[in-house]
A protein has these predicted regions:
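Iron-sulfur cluster-binding cysteine motifs and their immediate structural context
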Residues: 101-131, 141-168
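SIR2/sirtuin NAD+-dependent deacylase catalytic core
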Residues: 98
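Conserved small/polar residues in nucleotide/adenosyl-binding loops
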Residues: 171-177
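Auxiliary alpha/beta "docking" domains used to position bulky ligands
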Residues: 1-95, 134, 143
């Protein structure tokens, strides 16, 4: 009898699919309006976190995750560069304040420094890595077989909405011509 634990991301085969579908809808509108665009979803060559914070949608938490009021860390990010001006987002000054529940809940101490993740101590990192899991991590991993959401589930802004939320932010940039 095994009691295996999994993280929220593993529930669907492609947990980015709802976001990809929404971005596809937006791209179709841009195509009809003849607006040039380039989108990025979960692309390691694009740092969408910078645009997330500057858009005013939320902030980087002490867990290093991007947080929004009401949803906390439970969202996926995408960025669309467009050759069109949009109304500028109101930049709000969010923060975690004195909260450190993500750091306290991390079973391996991967979040001992605020706003920094030590990936060598992160269960999710090792369970998704193609490398051999270090011996010293095996006890901490225990019965988790696909990631660890302890830092996410402890985050107060996301306590009521532990699901994927689709948010769209527009940042005015000009696309280079190719």
């Amino acid at each position: 009898n095994y009691n295996l634990k999994y993280n929220m991301e593993s529930i669907t085969e492609d947990y980015y699919l709802p976001l990809k579908n929404k971005i596809n809808e937006i791209e179709q509108v841009f195509e009809k309006l003849n607006i040039k665009f380039k989108s990025f979803i979960d692309n390691p060559n694009h740092y969408d976190r910078t645009f997330f914070v500057s858009s005013g949608l939320g902030w980087q938490g002490k867990s290093t995750m991007m947080l929004t009021p009401g949803s906390g860390p439970w969202q996926l990010l995408a960025t669309i560069y467009v050759d069109h001006a949009f109304e500028e987002s109101k930049n709000t000054n969010y923060s975690c304040g004195e909260c450190n529940l993500c750091q306290i809940s991390c079973p391996t101490g991967a979040l001992n420094s605020e706003y920094k993740l030590d990936s060598n101590k992160c269960i999710s990192y090792w369970l998704q890595s193609p490398e051999l899991i270090p011996y010293e991590m095996r006890d901490a991993i225990g019965n988790k077989f696909y990631g660890c959401d302890d830092c996410l589930t402890s985050c107060p802004p996301g306590q009521e909405n532990n699901n994927v939320v689709i948010s769209v932010s527009y940042t005015h940039l000009t696309l280079p011509t190719t």
